[in-house]
C-alpha cells in the first residue's frame, strides 16, 4: 500500500512537471511548491533542505517536501522557519506526525515541542535520525511498546517507558537510530 501510494504520487507529479515547461525547470517539484503558495525563495530554501537530507540519509524525493527513506517510511520536511511540514501532496501522502500523532506511530521531530521536519515510524524497525541538536519525539504506539535510542554503534543507550510517552526537548546529538519497538 505504501509503495503504491508513493508510486502513484510520483507519476502524478511527473506528469505535472512535464506539462509545467520552463516554470518547473529549476526543480521537478517547483510547480507543486508554487501551487502550495511558496515563493521562489521559499521553494529554493525548501529544496536546499531536502537536498541536504538526501545527501545525509539517502532516499528519493517524492514530493516537494517529502523523502521516501528506502521504502520503509517517509520524511516530511518543514519549510525553514515553519513549525510543521505543509501538506503539498493534497492528502496523497499522510504525515502521521501532524496534526497530532496517529495511533500506532512513533514520531521524531527536528525541533523542540514537536515541531519541524518529522519522521513517522510505524513498522518495527531501526530508523536513522539525522539531527544533532535538540528535538522532540512522541511514542503513540500500542500501549507499553518501548522505543530504544541507539548510538552510532547501534547500541541501545536509553529507552523510553513505553507508549504513551513523549519528550518535548530531547537531545539528538548522541542518537543515530531509533528502534521503535
PLM region descriptions:
Residues 89-181:
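Mature secreted bioactive peptide module from preproproteins
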Amino acid at each position: 500500500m505504501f509503495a503504491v501510494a508513493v508510486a502513484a504520487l510520483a507519476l502524478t507529479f511527473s506528469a505535472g512537471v512535464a506539462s509545467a515547461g520552463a516554470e518547473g525547470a529549476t526543480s521537478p517539484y517547483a510547480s507543486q511548491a508554487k501551487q502550495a503558495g511558496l515563493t521562489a525563495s521559499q521553494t529554493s530554501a525548501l529544496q536546499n533542505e531536502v537536498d541536504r537530507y538526501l545527501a545525509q540519509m539517502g532516499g528519493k524525493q517524492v514530493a516537494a517536501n517529502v523523502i521516501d527513506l528506502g521504502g520503509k517510511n517517509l520524511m516530511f520536511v518543514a519549510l525553514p522557519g515553519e513549525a510543521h511540514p505543509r501538506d503539498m501532496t493534497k492528502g496523497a501522502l499522510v504525515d502521521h506526525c501532524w496534526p497530532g500523532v496517529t495511533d500506532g506511530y512513533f514520531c521524531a521531530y527536528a525541533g523542540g515541542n514537536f515541531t519541524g521536519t518529522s519522521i513517522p515510524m510505524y513498522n518495527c524497525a531501526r530508523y536513522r535520525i539525522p539531527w544533532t541538536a535538540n528535538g522532540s519525539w512522541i511514542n503513540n504506539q500500542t500501549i507499553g511498546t518501548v522505543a530504544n535510542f541507539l548510538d552510532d554503534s547501534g547500541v541501545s543507550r536509553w529507552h523510553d517507558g513505553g507508549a504513551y510517552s513523549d519528550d518535548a526537548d530531547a537531545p539528538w546529538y548522541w542518537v543515530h537510530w531509533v528502534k521503535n519497538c
